[in-house]
Amino acid sequence: MVHATSPLLLLLLLSLALVAPGLSARKCSLTGEWDNNLGSIMTIGAVNDNGEFNGTYITAVADNPGNIKLSPLLGIQHKRACQPTFGFTVHWNFSESTSVFVGQCFVDRSGKEVLKTKWLQRLAVDDISDDWKATRVGYNNFTRQRTVEE
């Protein structure tokens, strides 16, 4: 027995076949310029084949805001995932402190890339008795800066 296939059913199947590839997870890329919820700006260069990258960071927040300088960062990410985890270190050029960030690069439901991070900042102290107050902990959410084309 042969059944006639409805043109509507064929149209539905064709539509699904064309739309389904676009529903797959979009890859999140660290490379580019980002700003965070505090107004800091980070630029990440190309990620090499080993997952390593470098860049710069200019913070919007500091104990002495008049001394803020562009500071280098160095990091690594897992390359295989569409939404990779990563970590990087910032060597602050204007203070005796270092920060480390860990996070994950996500593509949200609206298609925008977001870096969700947690950080530790180690301040230099003159005496071991001050060690208890030398490490700060926090979080930042970074979003990709708009480009001229957007």
Curated annotation (Swiss-Prot):
Modifications the protein undergoes after translation, according to the UniProt entry = Glycosylated.
Query: What PROSITE patterns does the entry give?
Result: AVIDIN_1, AVIDIN_2
Q: Which residues are glycosylated?
A: 54, 93, 141
Q: Where is the Avidin-like domain?
A: 26-147
Query: Which parts of the sequence bind biotin?
Result: 36, 40, 57, 59, 63, 95, 99, 140
Xref: InterPro entries: Avidin (IPR005469), Avidin-like_CS (IPR017889), Avidin-like_sf (IPR036896), Avidin/str (IPR005468), Avidin/Streptavidin-rel (IPR051764)
- Keyword Nucleotide-binding assigned to the entry: answer is no
Q: What is its main location?
A: secreted
Note the Pfam families from the entry: Avidin
Q: List the disulfide bonds.
A: 28-105
The reply to whether Transcription regulation figures as a keyword in the UniProt entry is no
Record SUPFAM superfamilies: Avidin/streptavidin (SSF50876)
The residues forming the signal peptide are: 1-24
Keyword field: Biotin, Disulfide bond, Glycoprotein, Secreted, Signal
Which GO molecular function terms does the record list?
A: biotin binding
Question: Quaternary structure?
Answer: Homotetramer.
Q: What does this protein do?
A: Forms a strong non-covalent specific complex with biotin.
Q: What is this protein called?
A: Avidin-related protein 6
Organism per entry? Gallus gallus
Lineage, please? Eukaryota, Metazoa, Chordata, Craniata, Vertebrata
Gene encoding the protein = AVR6
